[in-house]
Every structure is written in structure tokens, then in C-alpha cells.
Amino acid sequence: KEQIWKGETRIPDEIFLDNVVFHRVNTEGITSCRPLFYAQLQERVAGKQMEAAILETNYWCAEEATYQATDDRTISAEAVYRNGIGRCGEESVFTVNALRSIGIPARQVYAHRWAHCDDNHAWGEVWCEGTWHFLGACEPEEILDLGWFVNASSRSMMINSRIFGSQQADGDVIEHPDVTSGVNQLSRYAKTVDLELFVTEEDGTPVADAEVSFELLNYAELVAISRKKTDANGKVVLRTGKGSLFVSVWKEDRHVTAILDTREISAQTLVLAGKKAEKSAEEFLI
């Protein structure tokens, strides 16, 4: 990293290892694409300061690939380059790999589902001048921290990055389904609320290790944006946006649900009282 960015030797080793050296961005196919991208970008970014090199790299990405919706598994960064097309998740995989190929820490972030409409989006973040900044992948702007999704992301209930294995999270872990973990990055984009949820028995005894799913209505289905377990005090905390969430809590054969508006409340107690959740009909505020 000293050879490429002489003025950026302050990049922490952990960030460099996790967001430059590491080979994977998300669930994409893996090929040896970095030497190919480096050969294309080396002269183009030579002599530039780090931020200017980031912006120039994104211009190159826009020249090489454009958006096209797909439904298959996320293709490799090299496949996006050779095909010239990819959905937002694939464009961001491509852009992150291009940036990593020239020694710039980069990662993918995404809103798994928007709160205000039926859709989602993924983009990139880069480490520059001591902090993380965002950019639209293959959607170049003249400055960092600007993109068409700025207003949309400000209404989000969750935006997250992904880490693998023993990599250290730089925020609250919102789910840990397998060898990967989702990390909450929402505070960079939206006003947030720390929603405290307490799960108790009917007599008020805290329920430890209850499964809690925080869900968002999108495409006529409830989609989990975070899954956690209650602690020994029956408590779980989620940093989220301002809007409506469907919360589902269960332990063994007991289950309770609720719809919470985080614009009005920041704490709620739910009681595990029965074997099945009662059906309810309420409005979601988006």
C-alpha cells in the first residue's frame, strides 16, 4: 500500500487486509480479476491523490459496464467487465474489485429493501482520509458522498455491509446466519433510533435467547432486515430508521408479533403468552 498511496500509509492494517487483500465482496463468482483491472487503471490513476483516483476509477467502471436487471446468482467482477452489464449488486462488486486492485479499501453496502417503495439497491463505500465514504457504483460523480440514492437511503430502515469469518465489525452486527455477518451502516445515511425491545413472560420474567426478527414490508411480503436474540435480561436493541417495522419474537412453541412505529416509540415490551400469534391488521407508515 505504501508503494501505491504514499500519502495514505495511515490506512489501518485491518482495513487494508479486509477491504483490499480479501478476495470476496459478497456472493459473487470468484476469478483472478485484480491483475486485469490493475493493468487497465495503473496509468490512469498514476500521480493522483487518493480521492481523485477513486473518482477516476468509478468513471472507468462506468465506461466498462452499465445497468441491466438480472435474476441469477451474482456474477463475478470479471464477468461484469467482459459482458458490459450487471445489476446494481454486480456493478458494485465490479467497482469494489477495481478499487481494491489499485490498493484502495472498498466494500459493498446495500439496502436489502427500501422502506418507501418496492425495490432495493447496492452501492460502494471507500476508505479515504480516515473514514468511509460512499459512491454509486458505475455511477460517477465529481465528489464522494453523492448519488441518486441519497434521498432514498435517508428514509431507509437498514443499510448494511457484509463481513466474512473472523473479520471485525465496525458497527452493530444485525445478523449472523453462517460464516458471514451483516453490519449496520445506517447512521451514515439516515437519522436513526435505538429501538429497545424487552421480551417477558406473563409474570414479567425476562425471556433470554428469544429469537427476534425485525421485518420490513416490501413487494407484498415481510422481509427480515435484522435477526437477533435477547440477552439475559430479555433485551435486544436495534439501531434503525424512522418508520414502521413488523417485529416477530419466538422461543420454542411460543410466538408474539407487533408493528412498531419508531417515529413515536423507542422502547417496547412484548409478552410471550401463547403458542400462536394472533392475526392483526395494521397500517405500515413509510
What is the meaning of each model-derived region?
Residues 252-277:
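Structured interaction patches on ligand/partner-binding surfaces of diverse proteins
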Residues 243-254:
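A short, solvent-exposed beta-strand micro-motif common in secreted/extracellular proteins
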Residues 218-240:
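Short, acidic Ser/Thr/Gly-rich low-complexity loop/linker segments typical of extracellular
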Residues 39-59, 64, 68-78, 82-175, ...:
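Hydrophobic/aromatic-rich core segments of domains that either
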Residues 193-203, 282-285:
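A short, amphipathic beta-strand motif
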Residues 1-48:
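Linear, non-domain "peripheral" regions
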Residues 202-221, 242-243, 286:
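Short, ordered, surface-exposed loop/turn motifs in non-cytosolic proteins
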Residues 188-190, 270-285:
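Conserved "repeat-terminator" motif of extracellular CCP/Sushi domains
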